[in-house]
């Protein structure tokens, strides 16, 4: 009996979204009547500041943050507004031309907390609004220190920018400033300067509402208000450095980045965090080949605009002096020859050809890119080799840190390099080496001596080919050593735990003779299959998407800056 054709299930249509028309400085813009709450997702009335953003009108603000609950305490976003006038009979009053007459409100409103209504007109550039901004800035600067020459926030400071754009040219305040604590050690990663703090409460709301920890608060009163941690409690959760990102004035500074580099010297590169399977979007700040910081990059589908401290600080190994820099082979003279790579690739390809037919194994790291794992899988298929990857599990949390510390476990499964579950083939590989069935082992990005393949087993191999970034016991035992690159030194893609395929870009050059692994793996695949592969990462990704079902339909260009989710 023939099987009936599957009925296509179409998603239910989304309910219509009510929209309202408002005018911002005379320009009409249509916005949704409600927008989702950044914490709960429940609909909240669209506010003036959101309508202004839709009209591409910048409204200065300090306390407002689009991903935090509204506080409405800085008053910097004050605007004037009007609504359609109505008569005693509650009918609209019309102008002679038939348009609605606008009744201007006698009082300004804070744009961050005032909902829009149909027909509302918002004015952000009137003389009164400019005067209000001057007044707010004057109050904020009364006790603010002139720390700009030594402040880490200089160059990306909203107080600095708004003072130039909206403030007065001179201060009228002649009385002594109120002095507050400076260089307050809040915890293992944060230094607080209370004199710079403008009490916007962004950091308090972040720790309370995003992290779920009441760690910070405002103490004292009036001009003597200060930010402080709770008595006897360190500010030490795994997300503290996000408060440095959202602090608009440099009151909270990172001990890691403090006094290291002026931000206007940094080159910014869009990349991904590789410390776990979440795949947080980041910006790498570098100068002259040195990485100075990781910062979160906004992607609502992955990390919103946050990242954990563990991932943020996990970058110094990239610039380690211990990095592997030279290709090595049993012929020691190769190390000093300029053509070392081509010679070693030739030798390695010959060794692999001899191992074809089941006497080889391939272990690829789930910290490698999708493209590299795809090439490893092709190489293993050509050799008839057993493959696997190394699991890397630790404690996660409810926010961003995933228990899987490999950034590309999903990619390792989709490309076929990893067993299911990951690591289940490692005992088989160890047994194959022990019995002499496996004579050649190719390891990329892992120290397998920590995962059941000790030096005694590796010593039984006829050929051990290793590619890695830092020295290990496995690299020490290698017959052929191929220095690879960190993710910040190459381009490629990862697939996170939820199946989102995302790009990372090259920020700095690799040291010495190190090369992106996909380059020499492509050469090995070409030599063994006698077919030339793509010479660019774009072409390689598109080839992978055409051959691997899990990436079907994707293109490098189509990934954009925030990625595409696939079924896993």
Regions inferred by a protein language model and the residue ranges of each:
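Short, structural beta-strand-to-alpha-helix junction motif
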Residues: 36-50, 369, 516
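A short, sequence-level motif marking secondary-structure junctions
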Residues: 32-45, 112-118, 128, 296-301
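Catalytic alpha/large subunits of respiratory electron-transfer oxidoreductases
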Residues: 145, 193, 200, 205, ...
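Fe-S ferredoxin-like electron-transfer domains
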Residues: 2-13, 75-274, 278-282, 287-290
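Cysteine-rich modules of extracellular adhesion/ECM and protease-associated proteins
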Residues: 2, 14-18, 55-59
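Eukaryote-biased recognition of intrinsically disordered, low-complexity regulatory segments
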Residues: 15-30
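A basic, amphipathic helix-loop patch mediating RNA/tRNA/ribosome contacts
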Residues: 48-82
